[in-house]
Amino acid sequence: MQNLTISPLSTLPQVRVLGRCAGTDPLTLFWTGSGIELLFTGSELWVELNADYDTMEPWVSVELDGAWISRFAVNPGTSRMCIFRGAAPGRAKHVRLLKDVQAMSEDPAHLLQVTAICHAGGEFLPLPAPRCRLEFIGDSITSG
């Protein structure tokens, strides 16, 4: 592990928050599919997560350049998950980290937060605007 720079999400305006989330320090991921998306040109990238649960552990999925590369349960407490290291510096890598389970109302202790991005070298680039957007109109189940 190189010397990593630890950056709270609030210091990285290029990181896109996905889903309905409030605040960024820490970013609490409550809903399925909520997460973060970013473009990074460095050689090493880690995500610092905070999790808790009594019976139903939180799971996350990671996509790198459009390919699903990992799915894992997050252990209780604060931990760092390596997204990539030893990657070609200077080339932009497109990363998405998504909560892979639903909100767990049966487990009041269930918690998943992104607390920081840890990185070596490179820079965060602005993401292009999404090609299309969907709007769901419906009852309280659909709209919250």
Residue ranges of predicted features:
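N-terminal secretory targeting modules
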Residues: 1-137, 142-144
